[in-house]
Amino acid sequence: RSQRAGLQGSEILSDPVRVGARAEIVLCAGAIGSVQIMERSGLGQVERLSGMGIRPRHRLAGVGENLQDHLQLRLIYKVSGVKTLNAQAKHWWGRAAMGLEYLLFRTGPLTMSPSQMGVFTRSSASVDRADLEYHIQPLSLERFGEPLHDFPAFTASVCHLRPSSRGSVHINHPSSLAQPQIDPCYLATDYDRQVAASAIRVTRGIVNQAPLAAYRPQEYLPGPQYESEEALVEAAGKVGTTIFHPVGTLKMGPASDPSAVVDAQLRCHGVRGLRVADASVMPTITS
């Protein structure tokens, strides 16, 4: 049975206002945001919504499921005999000099993208096409939001392009001010753990090549003490973080697929006048 879609929104910190639609509503809030709007509107898993006091309006078991993301493993190497952005950008005077150079000459670090090099390669000879991607940055930090290191270093960020792990996104409170519950389930499958371990080995092999020998690279993170398969998987969990590519939580597929939320025209199954047009509809993550 098809339901007619209606939109209920609210101004920030004010009473809700109801907005109708003469034709269609198109959700474009992303793989995290669109799920929250759907669930708070009563579209999703009936038991989950009922448990939070939300009146279920249409059962869609796939809402919030099938979350996929690229997990980047941030391997950091100390180097010698060369300057990196750690020295240039760590202190205010260095940042001021960078800004002045850009203003006067339109040159210098502020003209660069965050990553100066990208590489595609295979995690092993058994795969028929590249399944790893590198982003190389001439800087390093312990984790996002923290200061740059006080030693020269570069970061080799490597991610598995086609992970098999699947997570979920769901609301945990009816209020639109509440944060969602995001469970990415990184490295949840044997295959993903195997590729992660291989990615660290491949990175070490690249760094140990002759062209980099003059800079005497030393592995800082995760550290050379991680050697066995089990240890490398543990290391991947320590240095891994999102690369901000969440997709799949409102999966596209035929109505015969119980996990599908929208059809090939992005129309929500069973709900007239509602489409979703963002990365949440992607059945699988792209590389």
Where are these regions (language model features)?
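Active-site rim elements
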Residues: 36, 60, 103-108, 157, ...
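Core beta-strand elements of the Rossmann-like FAD/NAD(P) dinucleotide-binding domain
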Residues: 13-24, 28
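Mid-to-C-terminal "cap/lid" subdomains and adjacent gly/pro-rich loops that border
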Residues: 23, 35, 45-150, 207-210, ...
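Glycine-rich, N-terminal phosphate-binding loop of Rossmann-like dinucleotide-binding domains
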Residues: 29-30, 41
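N-terminal low-complexity segments that are often proline-rich with Ser/Thr-Pro
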Residues: 2-14
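C-terminal segments that line or cap access tunnels to active or ligand-binding sites in enzymes
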Residues: 118-126, 132, 137-142, 151-216
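A glycine-rich dinucleotide-binding beta-alpha-beta segment and adjacent secondary-structure elements
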Residues: 132-143, 150-157, 210-285
